[in-house]
Amino acid sequence: MGSNLPAQPNLRVTIIAADGLYKRDVFRFPDPFAVATVGGEQTHTTSVIKKTLNPYWNEMFDLRVNEDSILAIQIFDQKKFKKKDQGFLGVINVRIGDVIDLQMGGDEMLTRDLKKSNDNLVVHGKLIINLSTNLSTPNTNQANGLHRSNLQSSTSSGLVPQVTAPHASPGPSQLDPTASNPSLNPQRVPSTTRPSSTVAPVNGAAAPGASRTNLSSFEDSQGRLPAGWERREDNLGRTYYVDHNTRTTTWTRPSSNYNEATQRTQREANMQLERRAHQSRMLPEDRTGASSPNLQENQQAQTPPAGGSANAVSMMATGATTAGTGELPPGWEQRTTPEGRPYFVDHNTRTTTWVDPRRQQYIRMYGQNANGNNTTIQQQPVSQLGPLPSGWEMRLTNTARVYFVDHNTKTTTWDDPRLPSSLDQGVPQYKRDFRRKLIYFRSQPALRIMSGQCHVKVRRNNIFEDSYAEIMRQSASDLKKRLMIKFDGEDGLDYGGLSREFFFLLSHEMFNPFYCLFEYSAHDNYTLQINPHSGVNPEHLNYFKFIGRVVGLAIFHRRFLDSFFIGAFYKMMLRKKVSLQDMEGVDEDLHRNLTWTLDNDIEGIIELTFAVDDEKFGERRTIDLKPGGRDIPVTNENKHEYVELVTEWKIVKRVEEQFNAFMSGFNELIPADLVNVFDERELELLIGGIADIDVDDWKKHTDYRGYQEQDEVIQNFWKIVRTWDAEQKSRLLQFTTGTSRIPVNGFKDLQGSDGPRRFTIEKSGDPAALPKSHTCFNRLDLPPYKTHETLEHKLSIAVEETLGFGQE
């Protein structure tokens, strides 16, 4: 055939990219390269693209061909090229005369499915090439080779290669919302986990891109995005959009008839929905917390304290007390400090307090009242909920459960002697535990508000920067004084409402992935985890300390943040060891692969060592999980150790610096030994509160597998959920979805690990077993229980006793 070929090259072949290659290794992505061959005589090889299923080469080769020439392009994995199968990933064969007329000339773009070889190995994906008879332009492979180092990417890190966009980078007005505060620049350098198609990569990082074709990040298959908008992909390959005009991100593509005024109106409407949802959150049975929905519904039937029930609910929401009048209780005395400040001495217990024991505080009482309701509001003197009675002591079990010791009778009890016995009647055990933990937690000296005021003045449109400056300049002891928030240009005194608004707005801003400090989890698009690449901002550790202070400040002053983290984050805050189960919210694919490794014989199937590859700002490193790990093979005998080490590295070690900075700020206000009284689910509720869950909306957006909505089991399930209070519903939501967070637009926007995922109840399991949950898929496996009572009993046990965020 060679004798029939022209003396000079007459066809230029450009191997552009492959898409969706087959992943043969459980844990590693291939290092693909392509080999182009004509008649076995002319062979050209592309460069190797590291760790990706979607390599982009864009390399040109000039060949001598005729119409009968067969162009064969094979894809191999460079890691396995010396193995028996050479890491074969697919091949295409093209007869030149079938696609292009060499005499007439032309230019053809081809997309072909990859085919199997004679070994019949499974292959997958497509190959994109270009054939052209125009050889007048110089072959730019050398230039491409120089540029290609900035285009190599890793699917595992969320980077997808792309031709550099011809569009200019967004201007300073779009990328610098912190011009008023030069120290706060978390977004000045593009994040490698949130790639954008700006032209100049920073620090040699991989040139960002969010498409596998020649589209820039300012356009997609539907056309160009509105001005100021950018398309990006997260570390899981999910497309999202950045609005540089407002410094916000969204999963929804802006419409072609995008109107800024309309969008602003929609944002404000969504913000109002979120604000109302946030301000209605509360803690279970927290006597100084916000009122519960059930309490408000039964408000007319409750026994109103002086001043009316509406006033009582309002005072409960702010933790307010009525003025102290009349004589002091027996055994009490009022004294004055040298500075003239009054304090009170309780000679009964030989203790002192700043709180006037005559002041009345509103608490919730449980048990049947005269109207048959389970909840009443009563006034309770603070002195009765002050120190424990003489001879009593509060202790913790080794599982952090609060109990009380009566040294007078040498007995112990779970019941708080300061609370009426009716408080615990008919209340579930886990709920009494949480309430007691709250009482214990907030009764500690370290959690008492100090005298004086802590003034924080911020601008609404600059709340992140102003809050950073205000909170970081004050000492921890100053932050423990009564918090007084002032919004610039607005009149108003802070009796609780302003501080709630402050934490609501600030949590929306500082946890915004736009700043690269946090990113969305693998579980959904509203729970957060620390961004391991936050170091793109050189001041990131200072911001994590600031965020830790804010979280501690909210807990200290009994306010809630409108943010929710992955379950592993709460475990880390409690210094608990993370497990493979926690990996599900961080990297679902890795979780599945590690689980497969534990459940199967891996000898001769997968080749692993005690090392992992990590890419940071374009630099790829091999990290030993243990000394000399890259030389230690993983076997059936040591695979459990390997899984533990990979889990710890992926969840903890990668963000250790950031997390330690966060905890240093947090522990300045909340001592570590006190917060450890809670478990990880309770800590989520302590930080974010409990939402009022709309059961009708939940039911409306639920799918069934194996069941019909009319089935008795399903009818009983929803009856049970309706009878549960807000905390039980939130715990059920935690159990089935991994978080108590509800999307702002309700259950119709519930997300799973792979995008929108409705809540699902599946008929699965033995009626003698407990229900199971799959949090990444928002699914509840519900056995076909015969009776209403059995279903409620089994479901309650599963929800209340399960450790962590779901069982599977």
Swiss-Prot record:
Annotated region (Disordered), positions in chain: 134-231, 275-346
Keyword Translocase in annotation: no
Cellular component per GO, a single term: nucleus
Low complexity biased stretches: 199-210, 317-326
Protein location: Cytoplasm
Gene3D superfamilies listed in its UniProt record: 2.20.70.10, C2 domain, Hect, E3 ligase catalytic domain, Hect, E3 ligase catalytic domains
Enzyme class: transferase
Annotated keywords: Cytoplasm, Repeat, Transferase, Ubl conjugation pathway
Occurrences of domain HECT (ranges): 475-808
InterPro entries: C2_dom, C2_domain_sf, E3_ub_ligase_SMURF1, E3_ubiq-protein_ligase, HECT_dom, Hect_E3_ubiquitin_ligase, WW_dom, WW_dom_sf
Residue intervals of the WW domain: 223-256, 326-359, 386-419
Stored PANTHER family: E3 UBIQUITIN-PROTEIN LIGASE NEDD-4, HECT DOMAIN UBIQUITIN-PROTEIN LIGASE
Chain's role: E3 ubiquitin-protein ligase which accepts ubiquitin from an E2 ubiquitin-conjugating enzyme in the form of a thioester and then directly transfers the ubiquitin to targeted substrates. Probably involved in the regulatory network controlling carbon source utilization.
Family: Belongs to the RSP5/NEDD4 family.
Entry protein name: Probable E3 ubiquitin-protein ligase hulA
UniProt organism field: Aspergillus terreus (strain NIH 2624 / FGSC A1156)
Gene it is expressed from: hulA
